[in-house]
Amino acid sequence: MLDYKIRAGDTLSKIAKRFNVGVDAIVQCNGIRNPDRIRVGQKLKIPASTTDAMDAVVPSVAPPPPPPDGLDGPPINRGKFVLLPKEYMGEVKKKDLIVLHFTAGTSAKSAFETWKNNPVRVATCYTVDPDGSIYELLDPAHWAFHLGVKGSNGKHDKRSIGIEIANVGPLKIDANKPDQLNWWAREWGTRWYRRDETSKYVPASYRGIDFFAAFPDEQLDAVGQLVRHLCERCEIRRKVPAKAHRGKCDLTRFGKFTGVASHQNFRKDKWDIGPAFDWDRLWL
């Protein structure tokens, strides 16, 4: 067991990565109630291994849930990528659902460039870059089309807040270089990473694809903070689908669901948010 004093800029995921242990192990060893509420100078016990974490003293009674993250929320850039009123629906709607997407691209900027000047008003309220930067494109009180559920007249778009996470999504093995994974741009001809760079992708079979791009820790932390902030601000239930249903499209179930879901729950032809996303990192 090691001692560590938190420094400026630290997050639990960064500390865990530095010492090659799991975030859950640090949380368990230190009785941390809210992983986002750590402070500079705070002392932590760092388990040298998973066994150390399992040997740590665990309270017989589960700790209470973490306190709300607060209405101020995480840092959000509300000036860089802003849609014009003509590019979304201005009516105010009560929200009871958050829907996670990935952009199938490399940046928040590329998503914004696709949506601006688009007369059909397709967009999400937020985008999150790989480095964890969060951008608000329109106030979540309003809405835009982001689900594409046929015959619904935008019913679920109106009640939901869409979050696009910059991630290329599905990957395929290069036809001529079996040690390389490509993403879909240029007909699956754009290099992603080598197959031995295993931190950059997740091997998982889903809807005809066997590999998916990984989400960086900084991005996962930012998405979790944003989701919890929106749940607090908009009074959305802090609930995710059961594991057995996270990858399924079921309009009967998800048409009534309130909480946090993903695009794949509403469309059989969509991969997002996919098997590479770690739902536990939402800390709901």
Question: Which residue ranges define each predicted feature?
Answer:
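Extracytoplasmic/periplasmic, Sec-exported soluble proteins
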Residues: 7, 15-18, 90-92, 118-119, ...
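N-terminal catalytic cores of peptidoglycan-degrading enzymes
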Residues: 55-157
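Short loop/turn segments at strand-loop or loop-helix junctions that form parts
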Residues: 163-168
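Short acidic beta-strand-loop surface patches of small beta-rich interaction domains
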Residues: 27-34
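Basic/polar, cationic surfaces and motifs that engage anionic cell-wall
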Residues: 65-75, 91, 169-284
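Sec-exported extracytoplasmic/periplasmic mature domains
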Residues: 17-21, 31, 46-49, 139-142, ...
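Primarily a LysM-type cell-wall glycan-binding module
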Residues: 1-21, 42, 48-51
